[in-house]
From Swiss-Prot:
Top-level EC class as recorded in UniProt: hydrolase
Keyword flag Thylakoid: no
Record flagged with keyword Cell division: no
Protein keywords: Cell membrane, Hydrolase, Membrane, Metal-binding, Metalloprotease, Protease, Transmembrane, Transmembrane helix, Zinc
Name of the featured protein: Protease HtpX homolog
Encoding gene per record: htpX
Length: 299
C-alpha cells in the first residue's frame, strides 16, 4: 500500500504541474490581454516565469522555503535532542539524514521540504521543542520524515513554487489596475468594441482575481489526503500510535503562529499555521485534527 502511494505521488507530480501551468497560462493570457494587448505574449511570458520559478524551487527548495519561513539551520551540537530524534526516524525510514532547521516561534508546528529524500530538510518551531515530550517529538518528526519517504515533499515543493508564481502575477496585475495605466487604456479601447471584446475583458479580470484561489484549492486537495498517510506512516515508524495522538492533541490546542506564513507555505506544516475561524475553515490546508485522531484510534 505504501509503495503504491509513493508511485501515486510521483504521478500526481506531473498532474499537479499540468494544472498549475494551465492556471499560469490563464493568468498570463489575462495579464497580456489587459496590459500589453497581446494575450499570447502574456501567456508565453507567464509560462517562462513559472518554469524558471519551479526549477529554482526544485533545485534550491530548501534554502528558499526555509528563508520564506524564517528558519535557521542547526546541528547535533546546537540542537542535540531534535537531531537525535530526526536521526532515529530517518534510520528507521531508511532515508538519508535530512538537514534540520528551527523556527523561533512559540506556536507548535513543523514541516518538511525538498525535491527528494537526498535533498530534504525538516523544520520545527521552538514552541514545539519546548512543549513536546520525547515520544510526541518522535511522532511529529516521524510524520515529517514520512513526507520525505513518501515523496510528498516533491509535490509540496512544486505546489509552493507555482502557487507563489500565480499569486505574484495576479498581485502584479492588481497593482497595475489600481494604478490605472494600461488597464484604463484597454477599457477605453473596448468601450466601443464588440461583445466578444467585452466578454474577454470580463473573463481576463475574473482570471486574475480567481486564479490564486484556484491554486489554493488545488493545494488543499493534495495536502489533506497526504496528511492522513503521513500520520499513519509515523505510527508505522514509531510503533506508538498514542504518541501521535498525544502530539496531535497538543497541536490542536496550539495558538496560530505569531510570524506571518504565506498561503503557499501553509500546506507544508503539520498543523495549519493560521487557524482562522468561520469562513476561513473552508480553506484549511489540513483535515480537522479530531478526524486525524479518530483515524489513528481505528488503526
Amino acid at each position: 500500500m505504501l509503495f503504491d502511494q509513493i508511485a501515486s505521488n510521483k504521478r500526481k507530480t506531473w498532474i499537479l504541474l499540468l494544472v498549475f501551468f494551465l492556471l499560469l497560462a490563464l493568468v498570463g493570457y489575462a495579464v497580456g490581454y489587459l496590459f500589453i494587448r497581446s494575450g499570447l505574449g502574456g501567456l508565453v511570458i507567464a509560462l517562462i516565469i513559472g518554469f524558471i520559478y519551479a526549477l529554482s524551487m526544485i533545485f534550491q527548495s530548501t534554502e528558499i522555503v526555509m528563508s520564506m519561513n524564517g528558519a535557521r539551520e542547526v546541528d547535533e551540537q546546537t540542537a542535540p535532542d531534535l537531531y537525535h530524534v530526526v536521526e532515529d526516524m530517518a534510520l528507521v525510514a531508511q532515508i538519508p539524514m535530512p538537514r534540520i532547521f528551527i523556527i523561533d516561534d512559540p506556536a507548535l508546528n513543523a514541516f518538511a521540504t525538498g525535491s527528494n529524500p537526498q535533498n530534504a530538510a525538516v523544520a520545527a518551531t521552538s514552541g514545539l521543542l519546548a512543549i513536546m515530550n520525547r515520544e510526541e517529538l518522535e511522532a511529529v518528526m516521524g510524520h515529517e520524515v514520512s513526507h520525505i519517504r513518501n515523496y510528498d515533499i516533491r509535490i509540496s515543493t512544486i505546489a509552493v513554487a507555482l502557487a507563489s508564481a500565480i499569486t505574484m502575477l495576479s498581485s502584479m496585475a492588481g497593482r497595475m489596475m489600481w494604478w490605472g495605466g494600461a488597464g484604463r487604456r484597454r477599457s477605453d479601447d473596448d468601450r466601443d468594441g464588440n461583445g466578444l471584446e467585452i466578454i474577454m475583458l470580463v473573463v481576463s479580470l475574473l482570471a486574475i482575481v480567481l486564479a490564486p484561489l484556484a491554486a489554493t484549492l488545488v493545494q488543499l486537495a493534495i495536502s489533506r489526503q497526504r496528511e492522513f498517510l503521513a500520520d499513519a506512516s509515523s505510527v508505522e515508524l514509531t510503533r506508538n500510535p498514542q504518541g501521535m495522538i498525544n502530539a496531535l492533541d497538543k497541536l490542536d490546542n496550539s495558538k496560530p503562529m505569531s510570524r506571518h506564513v504565506d498561503d503557499a507555505s501553509s500546506a507544508l506544516y503539520i498543523n495549519d499555521p493560521k487557524k482562522g475561524g468561520g469562513f476561513q475553515k473552508l480553506f484549511y490546508t489540513h483535515p480537522p485534527i479530531s478526524e486525524r485522531i479518530e483515524r489513528l484510534k481505528q488503526m
